[in-house]
Amino acid sequence: MARHRIYSMSFASVYPHYVAKAEKKGRSKAEVDQIISWLTGYDQHELQEQIDKKTDFETFFAEAPRLNPSRSLIKGVVCGIRVEEIEEPTMREIRYLDKLVDELARGRPMDKILRKN
C-alpha cells in the first residue's frame, strides 16, 4: 500500500487550521493544545518544539511521549470513515486528533472530549 501523503506533511502546516477551526466556533487555542496534550502526552514546550522543527505527522506521533490509553474510546466518523475501524496505526492517530478537534468545534464539553467519566 502506498504511503499516504499526510504522513510527510508537517504538523506545523496543519496546526493553524486546527486552531482556526476551533476559534471560528468560539473555542480557544489553549483548548486545542489541551486536546493535543491529552492525546499525545506533549507538554506545551514539547508541542512548540515539534511545531518549530516542522516535524512531519508520522514523526509527530512516533515521538509522542505518552499516547493516551483512553484514545481507544474515541468513536465516530471523520472524512466518511469510522475512526475505530482504521487499521493503519499512524492514520488512526491522525484521525483521532481530527475527531477531537471536530468535537471541540461543535461545542462539545471538554470533559466529554477528553473522555472523562
Where are the regions a protein language model picked out?
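A charge-rich, low-complexity, intrinsically flexible signal that marks solvent-exposed coils, linkers
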Residues: 1-117
